[in-house]
């Protein structure tokens, strides 16, 4: 077991010292009660039954009942407080892991699967709870009882105790042999389980596509393949565990049988009393059960320890911190400038997306961006939001290099509406005020009216307080986009970024909404990426992007005359 990992876990347990003291006292009480019962048995046999002293029998039974009561009460406190500590500790770990994850760089999520994240924050952390309970409760209890029972066995009979001690190294051999193999299998089992979680997440996020293409049978077969892979690791691990358990039981009970055989001979010879052998066998059984329990726990520790290791990697991967950010100059009219910017995604290192791009946009302007798929249009927005950092060149906001500014401060200036509207489970209203939870009811109602939400919300039973389901499953694509736009406008941004934000609306609705947006954003900047020319036809000027660079710019009329690429895009849409 990795001591460093356990030390890290101990850091989360330190703030629950009082609870842990109660757990330790309870553990010692449980162990002491069980061990004392052995000496009571010896007195019962030697002084009570053998000499026919009924009072000794009564006293022994009374002591046993008293010890059982202490055992029961102590067991209650042990179980309650250790599980309570485990729940509080894992909640703190879960919160810390979640807080770290949510502050990762965006590009790091390209390498992570959502299912793997979910699995780590749920299944892995549940395994850590098991680790806390098993180690602080059962492992320590069994260790105390093992040491105590062996010590008492030596007091009863040195010879018989030595026989029992010999069995421990015999049990250590298979534990060491199988341990490394089980650790590898545990890691693979957790990784395989994460793949299952990813598959489930992906399947039900795309359930409509699966139905539309009749892919249910294919998805079931694919899921079954992943399930069988997971099962193989689990079965192999369980076989090793079962084999070790069988070996442990055999060795322990053979040792007890040998003790009984030799002990019976010593009773006949008068070297031991009947009470001593009964007491010794009782301690031997406790030692055997405790030893078996310890080895069983050690063989099972690999899974939760691996889970802890996976969570610690999340917690230790702290976001890049900068303490020397410049103060954002927000007194001048808003402006944006790209100077010779290059960019390549880490996940696609051989494909340059932005190539020596330069552009400038000042306040009170509406900039449209067009280009073919993969030209780099959306990447412009991603860079402006500081989701990624450019390789070369400079991006300026208000003539300040954005790499020297706090990303959170930059994003306060911006409202972003992606093509696939980000809708959270909850109500229409809760999704809108996500953009500005300090907005007044009058401001919310005004935005709802402008974006056309009022019209469809009025048909719902609870209006804007209607539940819309996970990811807005009860809404149409156009309704989701209206909510996303309302959220952005409620933020009162200086820069509004629209990435195919009205693609689900008809042309008439789009134009009406666009006019409202332009009025609200007067004096600020609108950047709109569009495949549909009607979305940016009224822009002050339009950039045509191809192969990561600006190949033409101007008004719609200018580009219709002077840009072959722009004319082709317009012609293709007219053909459609």
From Swiss-Prot:
Keyword Cell inner membrane appears in the UniProt entry: yes
GO MF: ABC-type oligopeptide transporter activity; ATP binding; ATP hydrolysis activity
Localization in the cell: Cell inner membrane
Record-linked SMART domains: AAA (SM00382)
Main location: membrane
Assembly information from the UniProt record: Homodimer.
The family this protein is said to belong to: Belongs to the ABC transporter superfamily.
Entry function: Part of an ABC transporter complex. Transmembrane domains (TMD) form a pore in the inner membrane and the ATP-binding domain (NBD) is responsible for energy generation.
Protein name, entry field: Putative export ATP-binding/permease protein RC1073
Organism, scientific name: Rickettsia conorii (strain ATCC VR-613 / Malish 7)
């Amino acid at each position: 077991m990795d001591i460093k990992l356990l030390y890290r876990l101990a850091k989360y347990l330190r703030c629950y010292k009082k609870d842990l003291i109660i757990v330790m006292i309870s553990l010692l009480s449980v162990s002491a009660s069980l061990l004392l019962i052995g000496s009571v048995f010896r007195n019962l046999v030697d002084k009570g039954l053998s000499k026919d002293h009924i009072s000794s029998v009564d006293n022994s039974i009374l002591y046993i009942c008293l010890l059982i009561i202490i055992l029961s009460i102590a067991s209650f406190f042990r179980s309650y407080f250790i599980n309570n500590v485990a729940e509080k500790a894992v909640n703190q770990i879960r919160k810390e892991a979640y807080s770290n994850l949510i502050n990762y760089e965006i590009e790091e999520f390209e390498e992570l699967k959502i299912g793997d994240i979910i699995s780590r924050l749920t299944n892995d952390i549940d395994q850590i709870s098991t680790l806390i309970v098993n180690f602080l409760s059962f492992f320590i209890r069994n260790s105390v009882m093992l040491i105590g029972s062996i010590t008492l066995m030596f007091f009863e009979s040195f010879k018989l105790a030595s026989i029992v001690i010999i069995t421990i190294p015999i049990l250590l051999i298979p534990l060491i042999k199988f341990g490394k193999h089980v650790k590898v299998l545990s890691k693979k089992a957790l990784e395989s389980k994460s793949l299952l979680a990813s598959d489930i997440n992906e399947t039900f996020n795309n359930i409509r596509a699966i139905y539309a293409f009749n892919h249910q049978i294919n998805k079931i077969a694919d899921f079954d393949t992943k399930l069988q892979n997971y099962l193989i690791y689990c079965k192999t691990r369980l076989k090793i565990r079962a084999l070790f358990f069988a070996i442990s039981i055999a060795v322990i009970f053979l040792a007890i049988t040998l003790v009984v055989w030799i002990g019976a001979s010593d009773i006949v010879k008068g070297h031991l009393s009947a009470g001593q052998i009964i007491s010794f066998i009782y301690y031997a059984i406790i030692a055997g059960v405790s030893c078996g329990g310890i080895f069983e726990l050690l063989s099972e520790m690999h899974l939760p320890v691996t889970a802890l290791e996976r969570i610690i990697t999340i917690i230790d991967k702290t976001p890049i911190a900068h303490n020397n950010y410049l103060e954002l100059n927000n007194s001048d009219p808003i402006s944006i400038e790209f100077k010779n910017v290059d960019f390549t995604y880490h996940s696609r290192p051989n494909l340059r997306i932005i190539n020596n791009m330069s552009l400038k946009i000042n306040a009170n302007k509406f900039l449209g961006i067009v280009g073919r798929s993969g030209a780099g249009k959306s990447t412009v927005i991603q860079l402006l939001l500081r989701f990624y950092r450019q390789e070369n060149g400079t991006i300026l906001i208000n003539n300040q290099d954005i790499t020297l500014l706090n990303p959170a401060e930059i994003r306060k200036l911006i409202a972003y509406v992606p093509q696939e509207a980000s809708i959270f489970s909850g109500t229409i209203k809760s999704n809108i005020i996500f953009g500005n939870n300090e907005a007044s009811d009058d401001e919310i109602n005004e935005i709802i009216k402008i974006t056309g939400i009022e019209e469809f919300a009025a048909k719902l039973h609870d209006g804007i307080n209607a539940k819309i389901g996970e990811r807005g499953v009860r809404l149409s694509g156009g309704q989701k986009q209206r909510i996303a736009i309302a959220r952005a406008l409620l933020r009162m941004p200086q820069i509004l970024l629209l990435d195919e934000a009205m693609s689900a609306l008809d042309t008439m609705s789009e134009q009406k909404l666009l006019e409202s947006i332009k009025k609200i954003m007067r004096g600020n900047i609108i950047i709109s990426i569009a495949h549909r020319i009607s979305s940016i036809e009224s822009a002050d000027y339009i950039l045509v992007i191809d192969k990561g660079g600006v190949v033409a710019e101007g008004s719609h009329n200018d580009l219709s005359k002077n840009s072959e690429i722009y004319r082709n895009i317009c012609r293709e849409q007219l053909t459609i």
